[in-house]
Design a protein with these regions (language model features):
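Glycine-biased, small-residue-rich flexible motifs in mid-sequence functional cores and linkers
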Residues: 2-5, 83-218
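Short, positively charged patches
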Residues: 1-142
Length: 218
């Protein structure tokens, strides 16, 4: 394994900690020099930069060592991982206050050269809301405008399904790993997004949806 791939592997370790965003990861890198330096700092070093609970979580991840196998299985699961310093990282994400340290996806990433629209709404929507979401999704899909949403019940999923049915493309930004279908009732949409668009997440494979993970996802 060359040095670049080694650093990538250790960067994945940091991605496996769901409580660490881009800003905090950057602070850790500044303190310890590199992803491998962060890993080797251990719990004593981590306590200088993160809370006790996060340091303990990182220590458990390091001791269990399952993250190495998870990293090795990404290609087998057809899961891609891209970092801000690599070609292919979504440039628009670099403009937000806390850009992700790493970004996972299945399928494709949205194209910067094609217009995109985020459609977001209530999970428990009215009949009128459902109608508008379907019409909007169909219109965007027909006009080849990318629909980006959260694959949630209600407005999100309805608009995405309509866009796909109209021959368009859509991308689901998840509050869990891209290998997990959440909510489970959107299984058909999840599979279609993986084929016709993309499933995107800042959370590593295997990380299940938690209420605290959705605000950063949004």
């Amino acid at each position: 394994m060359n040095r670049m791939e080694t650093e990538r592997m250790y960067a994945y370790f940091l991605c496996s900690i769901p409580m660490i965003g881009g800003v905090r990861a950057g602070q850790l890198e500044e303190r310890f020099g590199s992803p491998q330096g962060i890993y080797e700092a251990g719990v004593t070093g981590w306590r200088e930069c993160v809370s006790e609970s996060i340091a303990e979580y990182m220590d458990r991840q390091k001791k269990e060592d399952a993250w190495r196998q998870e990293y090795a299985q990404l290609a087998e699961k057809q899961i891609h991982l891209v970092f801000p310093w690599e070609e292919g990282f979504p440039k628009k994400l670099l403009t937000i206050p806390d850009p992700p340290y790493g970004f996972f996806y299945k399928g494709r990433l949205p194209k910067d050269t094609i217009p995109s629209v985020a459609v977001i709404g209530a999970r428990e929507c009215s009949d009128y809301g459902r109608y508008v979401a379907e019409e909007l999704g169909r219109y965007l899909g027909t006009h080849r405008i990318q629909v980006i949403s959260g694959m949630a019940r209600g407005i999100d999923g309805i608009s995405q399904q309509a866009a796909l049915s109209a021959g368009g493309t859509s991308y689901g930004v998840l509050g869990c790993g891209v290998d997990i279908c959440y909510p489970s009732q959107n299984r058909r949409l999840y599979e279609e997004l993986g084929r016709e668009g993309g499933l995107l997440s800042t959370y590593a494979p295997g990380i299940r949806a938690m209420p605290a993970y959705f605000p950063p996802r949004n």
